[in-house]
Amino acid sequence: MEHKAPLVEFLGLTFNLSDMLMITITCLIVFIIAVAATRSLQLRPTGMQNFMEWVFDFVRGIINSTMDWQTGGRFLTLGVTLIMYVFVANMLGLPFWLDVTVNFGGNRRPTDATVTLTLRDGRRPHHYYGVKMKGASDYLRDYTRPVAWLFPLKIIEEFANTLTLGLRLFGNIYAGEILLGLLASLGTHYGVLGCGSIPMMVIMVWQAFSIFVGTIQAFIFTMLTSFYMAHKISHDH
């Protein structure tokens, strides 16, 4: 039986309740982690505070690798928010993959292109800060550097970078979901034959690999966002 995600029409717009639920849960988890890690700060961090400081240091390293800290320090909060949201969204549903798939018609929200393409709109501040920090004239001249005939290619690059930022996350996570579905079907088939333990072991190994891929994708998404920001605000480009 085919399971479809619940849809609701409101003011001419279609809302996917599965997406809305999982996005809300993801945001709540990130918010709870942030509050739990910062509500009683200590000079010697332990537990959740230690974890949160590690995340901040990690994102600080990402920013430092793409731009100088004096310029990029203002984007630290953005980077931490992105990496935590994408990571939690990728992990959400892994322990209960079958239940979530059956009940909600979906799993981790990065498997929905609508969500990942919305996340890629995080590139919009790039243009704002590019104009603010370089000036409108200097910012626009970047599209004709080093030679004017590159202008059409620079426009294509803008759309390509924006599109691939979201589709890369969607494609990698969605491919993992498809393979998990195939392995689950394989487990059901061999379970009937009395050999279900072997496919289930394969599923567990693939789940572990999915955790690795989800973590890497959160890093790559944050790294590329920082890189694109540096590309827009740096005077070297």
From Swiss-Prot:
The source's superkingdom equals Bacteria
Instruction: Provide the protein's localization.
Output: Cell membrane
**Residues of the signal sequence?**
none
Q: In its UniProt record, which GO terms are filed under biological process?
A: proton motive force-driven plasma membrane ATP synthesis
Give the Gene Ontology MF terms in alphabetical order. Answer: proton-transporting ATP synthase activity, rotational mechanism
Instruction: State whether keyword Transport applies.
Output: yes
Keyword annotations of the record: ATP synthesis, Cell membrane, CF(0), Hydrogen ion transport, Ion transport, Membrane, Transmembrane, Transmembrane helix, Transport
- How does this protein assemble? F-type ATPases have 2 components, CF(1) - the catalytic core - and CF(0) - the membrane proton channel. CF(1) has five subunits: alpha(3), beta(3), gamma(1), delta(1), epsilon(1). CF(0) has three main subunits: a(1), b(2) and c(9-12). The alpha and beta chains form an alternating ring which encloses part of the gamma chain. CF(1) is attached to CF(0) by a central stalk formed by the gamma and epsilon chains, while a peripheral stalk is formed by the delta and b chains.
Instruction: Kindly provide the name given to this protein in its UniProt entry.
Output: ATP synthase subunit a
Source organism of this protein record: Bacillus caldotenax
